[in-house]
Amino acid sequence: MPKIILNEKQVDSPEDDNLMSFLQARNIAVDNLILEFNGQILTGKDPLGTILLKDGDTLNLFSMVGGG
């Protein structure tokens, strides 16, 4: 079972899991998030369902905040 680093915490991921299903299983909506996956910036517009997770992958989530 791959171990993923999610916001600096180690979590398990099912074998052959993709990034979108990983997030959905944790009830994480990507609409207003910026994702840093292995040092690369992604958004909900990227094809997250095609990114397969591997042991040691790193994912950091940042929420968009607006204001004035």
What are the residue ranges of the model-derived segments?
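Ubiquitin-like/PB1-type beta-grasp interaction modules and other compact soluble beta-rich domains
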Residues: 1-67
